[in-house]
Amino acid sequence: MGLAAPRKRTKISHDPNNTNWSRSTSGYGHKIMSSQGWTPGSFLGARNAAHADMFTAASASHIRVVVKDDTLGLGARSKRDPLDEPTGLDAFKGLLGRLNGKSDADLEAEQKKHEDAKIARYAATKWHTVTFISGGLLAQEKLVSLSAQKESPGAQHGSHQNRGGLDMQKSEEDANTSIKDNTLKALREEQVSSVPIAEDTSRSKSKRHRKDEQGKKDKKERKTKKRKHMDEPSPIDSDIPERAILETDLQATVTDSRDTTPPVAKVLSKERRPMGRHLLRGRHIAQKKKALMDDRSLNEIFMVKS
């Protein structure tokens, strides 16, 4: 907007480094923690905890917050190089340390710490490291004394020999009993099987004979039923004279066609017509079939001169 823009007056705060909140002792959180027994510089939690040995000076300091400038999840590592730092930063820090009056030994120790941190970061990015957290000590549930298990070698040898002899005797007895049982079973099976052989053979023969006779009777009955069904007159007796006329016409046409070409198919004298709704249409269907089987009728249908 230039000069026409509204003026905005900004004042420098009295705490540019934002350290008053950490140094103040009148805050609500400081009062509660001090009432519970906490003092500035002490650790949080139980003093006799299992992980108390892992506390360092950083555990008593304030929590450090890192600004999140990406959309990655919590705990995710960015793909950028963790060693991407301004060049010469370590040397500049060492120079500032010398100006502040630090000794060379302190500066070398700090530089070594920085180098170790760089190596650890590089190794963590290249080879994924696994960090373990101590969760207590493992202890055996039952402490078994080894003195009770230890015995003299002579006694052990004697006990092994006795056990070996007992095992041999048991195996021999088991073998003898198994042989006896097998022989008894074989004798019983022979006695039982020798008696009913003749009876079984006679029974099986009689059963087969009965089955054969029943099968023959069933076949005869089926044949008689089929013959009766074929010999029964068709329900349409009024069409007999018309059938005779059509058959005579067909015979004449067939004789004529035999001279010219061989017959396509044989015409059955007895044709079974369907029952039901096709009863009235049976005549027309039969005439169409007969016309299609004759060459002259086909020529007449297609208006071809013979």
From Swiss-Prot:
Known function:
Involved in rRNA-processing at A0, A1 and A2 sites and negatively regulates telomerase.
Biological processes per GO annotation: rRNA processing
Molecular functions (GO terms): nucleic acid binding
The entry's keywords:
Nucleus, Ribosome biogenesis, rRNA processing
Where does it live in the cell?
Nucleus, Nucleolus
Q: Which cysteines are joined by disulfide bonds?
A: none
Q: Where is the composition biased (Polar residues)?
A: 15-27
PANTHER family cross-referenced by the UniProt entry: G PATCH DOMAIN CONTAINING PROTEIN, PROTEIN PXR1
Q: Could you name the domain of life of the organism this protein comes from?
A: Eukaryota
Residue spans with biased composition (Basic and acidic residues)? 182-191
- Protein family (similarity comment): Belongs to the PINX1 family.
InterPro entries per the UniProt record, alphabetical: G_patch_dom, PINX1
Listed GO cellular component terms?
nucleolus
The UniProt regions of compositional bias labelled Basic residues, in chain numbering, are: 1-11, 219-228
Query: Which protein is depicted?
Result: Protein pxr1
Q: Which part of the chain is the G-patch domain?
A: 25-79
Which parts of this chain are annotated as the region Disordered? 1-27, 148-241
